[in-house]
Regions:
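Surface-exposed, interaction-prone regions used to assemble/regulate multi-protein complexes
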Residues: 1-148
Length: 148
């Protein structure tokens, strides 16, 4: 089965060689990583961000790049765009391939949803954040972010 990735429509693009993850039972997961806003992208600069996943069912930290280990087994929704990345970003307010995805056809959600959310009220999603040499997968309900 081809893994279907849907880019999150965020104002930033993840571009990182380092991911820092902090997990607590009571406060979910906080990720610190490097991103680029459109102006950063134009100037080849980066800024730190913290993404906070509030209700978390599962966290997976894998020390391999997602695209390397799945090189012929994934598809990114919307990758058939034909306009310039900057033009797209300016027009729609988000990067067409943010590096932050939902896995649309998640085997984990299919197999564990009844365990993690038996009442079906958490609206769990399978998120993927790819780093340079690693990636993180998170089963969570929602997230918020702030620049540091």
């Amino acid at each position: 089965m081809t893994i279907q990735l849907i880019p999150e429509k965020t104002e930033f693009r993840i571009s990182t060689t380092d991911l820092e993850t902090v997990y607590t039972e009571s406060n979910g997961i906080k990720l610190r990583l490097d991103v680029q806003h459109i102006d950063d992208f134009k100037n080849d600069t980066y800024r730190d961000i913290e993404i906070h996943f509030l209700v978390v069912a599962e966290l997976r930290c894998i020390t391999m790049n997602f695209f390397d280990i799945n090189h012929q087994n994934y598809a990114i929704d919307g990758q058939e765009f034909t306009i310039d990345v900057i033009d797209f970003w300016e027009k729609y307010g988000y990067h067409p391939d943010s590096g932050f995805y939902q896995i649309n056809n998640s085997d984990i959600l299919i197999s564990k949803k009844s365990l993690y959310d038996p009442r079906n009220n958490l609206d769990l999603k399978h998120y993927l954040i790819n780093g340079y040499d690693s990636h993180i997968e998170i089963i969570a309900s929602k997230y918020e972010y702030r620049y540091l």
